[in-house]
Amino acid sequence: EAISYNDYINLIEKTVEELKSDSDTQKIVISRIKELDKHDIDLSETFKNLHQHYPNAYVYLRYDVEEGCWIGASPELLLKEENQLIQTVSLAGTKAKEDDWTDKEYHEQQVVTDYITATLSGFTNYIDVDGPFSVNAGFFEHLKSFISAQLIDKDKLYDVLKALHPTPAVGGMPKDLAKDFIIKNEGYNRT
């Protein structure tokens, strides 16, 4: 269920308080639902516009009887595999285009990169990290590193996927503490 703008601001303030507290939580990524009347939006036109404005993103349109319609554009590749070579990205740190990168954004990006490489280390022979690079995301920019690794056992690909998801870029860090906070406070089910 969608929450009001003021409730979302309150959630942001609560999240900041949690991060400043003695909690071990290092990062929490909150979100909210924006509900639109189905008559307010042309899905095919929106889908085309997302492709046009975010050419490097994974653009999706999904409909589920219970959950309704979800449409969006994600710049984050979770996992790709070909001949046991797996690829993913570490995407974190966001700023307005006109701003300069700060240590805060580089730290956020490194937390995600470290998490991904540590997770992959148990499944792979080697890991290569290229980046971070600044990437365009509409009105914003993100820091992105490309990560590739040689999978030891192709039968473990689904295990790798389960271990990676959700990355700290979409949930937080440590995963269990961030997930608990999100479940208790966001007011909707992200799955």
Residue locations for each model-derived region?
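Short, well-ordered alpha-helical packing segments
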Residues: 16, 47-51, 117
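Short, intrinsically disordered, charge-balanced linker/junction segments flanking boundaries
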Residues: 186-191
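Short coil/turn segments at secondary-structure boundaries
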Residues: 26-31, 61-64, 131, 158, ...
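An anion-binding catalytic pocket shared by soluble metabolic enzymes
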Residues: 32, 37-111, 144
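Conserved hydrophobic/aromatic pocket- or pore-lining residues that grip, position, or stack substrates
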Residues: 23, 79, 114
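Contiguous alpha-helical scaffold segments within structured protein domains
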Residues: 1-6, 10-13, 87-184
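Terminal domain-start leader segments
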Residues: 2-43
